[in-house]
């Protein structure tokens, strides 16, 4: 049996405080938390590739006296649809799933987003425990209470704020991930470095390979995950519903979401965020907000772990249309989260279209 080891615990305060537990061998703690919630049933939402992991958690839940209902959903963004959510609700209804019962979201960011949305809507809100299994899910999607599904109009335009009961980040799951998943998820970690924690950037600059290493000994990844979660936890504790401060977590995301829409959600989110950060860094440089060194620092760090720094997949007009749909926009103006220095965030509102074209040309040539 794998020994349970806790690496760090990050509190997320606010209206409904919870903890993010980071460690290894956490399945017993997941079952203990669910059993202590007063639930009689647990709905375990997961993707087909995680059937074996789900079976392990199922066994622990049943040993704790809980009935387990499996909600197997399609992989990645294809599972984040109203149709899939509807199928989940139908199964909950057939099982007489009650208000005291609990949903567990097991998987990457798409699975935890969907689990949170299904939980938020069922009986106007039941509890959810998030168990992210990808780097992206660990540092971004599973923390903060944002849930959602995709529609033809765009990504995450339908959703709800629904804070989890707890988040368990089991570092053992890193061993199951392909290299490209760890690389793509690292874009969100790097993002938090630029907006709030320069030590994250220094770790990548000191030894990029250690930042991707799965084995705990000698790896920077556990510390990077913990630091990134701590940044996000601090931000969402102060601003759950994205009224102001939480917007800083969208650094690089305005252009990223346009890319994802253009690519019909077939691009990895982290890769889109990487080119999104390069886009806003170039725009900020052209507007005199940052210097050439900070612009180059973006490129060097992203490139050091194999993240894309250019994008040639669409004409500007298509991407511009995607940016006009961004949730941060106000009064018809496209709004960008930008930097003036590492850890110093500002906003760019309604920039000249010519400047946007110039920034796009810099990353598409």
Swiss-Prot record:
Its cofactor is NAD(+); Co(2+); Zn(2+). It catalyses: 7-phospho-2-dehydro-3-deoxy-D-arabino-heptonate = 3-dehydroquinate + phosphate. Its main location: cytoplasm. Zn(2+) binds at residues 188, 253, 269. Keywords: Amino-acid biosynthesis, Aromatic amino acid biosynthesis, Cobalt, Cytoplasm, Lyase, Metal-binding, NAD, Nucleotide-binding, Zinc. One of its GO terms (cellular component) is cytoplasm. GO terms for biological process: amino acid biosynthetic process; aromatic amino acid family biosynthetic process; chorismate biosynthetic process. The keyword NAD applies. Binds 1 divalent metal cation per subunit. Can use either Co(2+) or Zn(2+). Pathway: Metabolic intermediate biosynthesis; chorismate biosynthesis; chorismate from D-erythrose 4-phosphate and phosphoenolpyruvate: step 2/7. GO terms for molecular function: 3-dehydroquinate synthase activity; metal ion binding; nucleotide binding. It is an enzyme of class 4 (lyase). NAD(+) binds at residues 75-80, 109-113, 133-134, 146, 155. Its EC number is 4.2.3.4. Belongs to the sugar phosphate cyclases superfamily. Dehydroquinate synthase family. Catalyzes the conversion of 3-deoxy-D-arabino-heptulosonate 7-phosphate (DAHP) to dehydroquinate (DHQ). NCBIfam families: aroB. This is 3-dehydroquinate synthase.
């Amino acid at each position: 049996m794998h020994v349970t080891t806790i690496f760090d615990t990050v509190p997320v305060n606010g209206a409904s405080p919870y903890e993010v537990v980071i460690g290894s061998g956490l399945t017993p703690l997941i079952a203990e938390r669910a059993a202590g919630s007063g639930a009689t049933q647990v709905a375990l939402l997961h993707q087909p590739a995680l059937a074996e992991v789900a079976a392990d958690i199922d066994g622990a839940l049943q040993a704790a006296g809980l009935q387990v209902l499996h909600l197997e959903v399609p992989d990645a963004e294809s599972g984040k649809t109203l149709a899939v959510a509807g199928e989940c609700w139908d199964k909950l209804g057939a099982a007489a799933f009650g208000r005291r019962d609990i949903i567990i979201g097991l998987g990457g960011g798409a699975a935890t987003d969907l689990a949170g949305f299904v939980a938020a809507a069922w009986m106007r809100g039941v509890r959810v425990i998030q168990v992210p299994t990808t780097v992206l899910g660990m540092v971004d999607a599973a923390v903060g209470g944002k849930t959602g599904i995709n529609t033809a109009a765009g990504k995450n335009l339908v959703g709800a704020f629904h804070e989890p009961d707890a988040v368990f980040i089991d570092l053992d799951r890193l061993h199951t991930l392909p290299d490209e998943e760890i690389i793509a998820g690292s874009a969100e970690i790097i993002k938090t470095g630029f907006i709030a924690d320069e030590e994250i950037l220094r770790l990548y600059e000191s030894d990029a390979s250690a930042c991707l290493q799965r084995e705990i000994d000698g790896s920077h990844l556990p510390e990077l995950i913990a630091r990134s979660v701590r940044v996000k936890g601090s931000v969402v504790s102060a601003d759950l519903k994205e009224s102001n401060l939480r917007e800083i977590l969208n650094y690089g995301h305005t252009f990223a979401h346009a890319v994802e829409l253009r690519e019909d959600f077939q691009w990895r989110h982290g890769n889109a965020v990487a080119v999104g950060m390069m886009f806003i860094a170039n725009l900020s440089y052209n507007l005199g907000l940052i210097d050439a060194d900070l612009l180059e620092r973006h490129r060097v760090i992203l490139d050091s772990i194999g993240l894309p720094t250019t994008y040639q997949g669409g004409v500007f007009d298509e991407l511009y249309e995607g940016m006009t749909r961004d949730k941060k926009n106000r009064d018809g103006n496209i709004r960008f989260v930008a930097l003036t220095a590492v850890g110093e965030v500002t906003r760019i509102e309604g920039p000249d279209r010519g400047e946007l074209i110039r920034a796009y040309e810099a990353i598409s040539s």
